[in-house]
Amino acid sequence: MVASGFLLIASFMLVLFVLSRPLGGFLARLIEGEPFSALQKVEAGLWRCSGVKNAEMNGWQYALAILCFNLLGIVLLFVLLMTQGSLPLNPEHLPGMSWHLALNTAVSFVTNTNWQAYSGENTLSYLSQMAGLTVQNFLSAATGIAVAFALIRAFARHSATTLGNAWVDLVRITLYVLLPIALIIALIFVSQGVLQNLDDYLHITTLEGVQQTLPMGPVASQEAIKVLGTNGGGFFGANSAHPFENPTAFSNFVQMLAIFLIPCALCFAFGQVVGDNRQGHALIWAMSLIFIVAVVVVMYAELAGNPHLSPLGADSNSNMEGKESRFGILATSLYAVVTTAASCGAVNAMHDSFTALGGMIPLWLMQIGEVVFGGVGSGLYGMLLFVLLTVFIAGLMIGRTPEYLGKKIDVFDMKMTALAILVTPTIVLLGTALALCTEAGRAGILNPGAHGFSEVLYALSSAANNNGSAFAGLSVNTPFYNLLLAAAMFIGRFGVILPVLAIASSLVAKKRQPAGNGTLPTGGLLFIGLLIGTVLLVGALTFIPALALGPVAEHLQVWLAH
């Protein structure tokens, strides 16, 4: 079993690097604005039809365009979800959502969180799934990548004022990257048995004579961008544990690769655009080391099982509760770490049924900001925030002004870095405290003790860090949780994006200084170790007290009692 686990991890990482390296080169061309002659006429037609000027924008113009674009998306999706009962492509005649659930869902999908306080097959029409959620899966992913593009340009350029054009970036990312790759992935899923139709639901009689309804729908097309764009929202309530959504071990492996594909490729693109591939490789090494350790810990915890099952005559050698037998513990553990290291949130098992230690690692990966590969775009700019913090700390230790890639890191940059890093932990801890201190918040907790606390902490961590997965034992389809989590998702998304673009606006105007004798090398093993240490230190200082009250206490209760 140990050998199988390491073989699975090694094969996954190998295939990931083989696929992401050439994609990184393609993304680098997009970042640098190299024209694609075959598609220039298509682009020109789009600009004429939309009336958009493709002149470059400064930092605040870029930020305003991104913010307005996403606010408009929230409004349009909210209206669609509220009125779906009166719209076509609704074979089950499902009514519109309540206003607070519609608001929560609209904010969720526009912010790339895909938190779902509902079950898709019982709540949403085909039109809402296709024109609402799937469209936002593309656009929210494009938003994150566009912000990463702007920050990469800020490091690559010097003595400049512009970061690119937000509209051009959004269109090119969608047309040249997301749509073609999503089409390929969707066809792979269809070949594996994932549904793709607009048929009415099937009403059948089982062998036992019981009536059963089988949901249908355009699943594969939504599933492809769900994983590629690190969105995570499932067509069905069971998400990727549902056999109509993720039927085979191969489709499961493809989903995991798709989740990490663009985040890993962006690291390669970063190194290429700034003119030093070692910079991108250093980020990949730091991310990979944290990721591999996290996977090993989860596999170990789930294989250890629950010792209290043995006296009951059950097999306690491994924890198969909440898992699909077609995937097994190893692939399920890997999927759980992939989806929470990235800001995806798709699940092929119930995280609420993991062991205390096995559930703590996905929770912690979200809490450190999902910078271990992370979401499309957000993972890279999140890790670059930790890079700036690392060079600042290193500069303090040696008594030099911190710099990165020849750019001096000044007071404004560090203020924005601190704001971006601290905004999500603040939301998580304050939101958890609010839920536990109010009757409406406590009413949703279905499990007592440490695990009930972990469910609330997980929900806020998932929402604020735009992940979307859940410990499903928490009842969240209430006005209190829908509004609280909607606020957490919105602030967690744009409370990081706006400071990142402010940093980009500051860096792009600076001159590039030649490296001196006292310059900290940022492409070697020493810096990789410092970066990992900084990520772990910030995560430890921020969340150890909360984790001690939840999963740590639960783990000790289980094993010390045994």
Swiss-Prot record:
Coiled coil: none
Keywords: Cell inner membrane, Cell membrane, Ion transport, Membrane, Potassium, Potassium transport, Transmembrane, Transmembrane helix, Transport
Keyword check for Cell membrane: yes
Record keyword Metal-binding present: no
UniProt GO MF annotations: P-type potassium transmembrane transporter activity; potassium ion binding
Database matches in InterPro entries: KdpA
Membrane topology: Multi-pass membrane protein
Subunit structure, interactors included: The system is composed of three essential subunits: KdpA, KdpB and KdpC.
UniProt xrefs under NCBIfam families: kdpA (TIGR00680)
Family of this protein: Belongs to the KdpA family.
Function noted in UniProt: Part of the high-affinity ATP-driven potassium transport (or Kdp) system, which catalyzes the hydrolysis of ATP coupled with the electrogenic transport of potassium into the cytoplasm. This subunit binds the periplasmic potassium ions and delivers the ions to the membrane domain of KdpB through an intramembrane tunnel.
The protein's name in its UniProt record: Potassium-transporting ATPase potassium-binding subunit
